[in-house]
Amino acid sequence: QRCKDCLYKLAIAVMNQWPGVRLRVTEAWDEDGHHPPGSLHYEGRAVDITTSDRDTKKYGLLAQLAVEAGFDWVHYESKYHVHCSVKA
């Protein structure tokens, strides 16, 4: 539930920051083993995100907005997405 609440706040922040752009979730809950053992994706507490326009120049600020939205851990994991997670 906390992850969902943070995503909701972040989606609003993204729309306010960049009109016409939306938050894009590329990975969330996972059951197919694409993440390392112990990944919070298996518990529904982690998401990988981008912007709908996939403008990588926005991802630094996207990460900052994710922190402000309440995510406990935010990591600009690759040039393709930002990883966010919440504590239990």
UniProtKB/Swiss-Prot annotation:
Where is the protein situated, by its record's location annotation? Cell membrane; Secreted, Extracellular space
Q: Does this UniProt record's set of keywords contain Repeat?
A: no
Query: Which superkingdom heads the taxonomic lineage of this protein's source?
Result: Eukaryota
Q: Answer whether the UniProt record assigns the keyword Metal-binding to this protein.
A: yes
Could you list this entry's UniProt keywords, alphabetically sorted.
Autocatalytic cleavage, Calcium, Cell membrane, Developmental protein, Hydrolase, Membrane, Metal-binding, Protease, Secreted, Zinc
The record, for Pfam families, names: HH_signal
Sequence positions that bind Zn(2+): H41, D48, H83
**UniProt binding sites for Ca(2+) 1:** T26, E27
- PTM text: The C-terminal domain displays an autoproteolysis activity and a cholesterol transferase activity. Both activities result in the cleavage of the full-length protein and covalent attachment of a cholesterol moiety to the C-terminal of the newly generated N-terminal fragment (N-product). This covalent modification appears to play an essential role in restricting the spatial distribution of the protein activity to the cell surface. The N-product is the active species in both local and long-range signaling, whereas the C-product has no signaling activity.
Major localization class: membrane
Cellular component, GO annotation: extracellular region; plasma membrane
GO BP, one annotated term:
proteolysis
- Residues annotated as binding Ca(2+) 2 are E27, D30, D32
Task: Tell me the protein family, please.
Answer: Belongs to the hedgehog family.
This molecule's function is given as: Intercellular signal essential for a variety of patterning events during development.
Q: How does the record comment on the protein's domains?
A: The desert hedgehog protein N-product binds calcium and zinc ions; this stabilizes the protein fold and is essential for protein-protein interactions mediated by this domain.
Q: Name the chain's protein.
A: Desert hedgehog protein
Organism of origin is Danio rerio
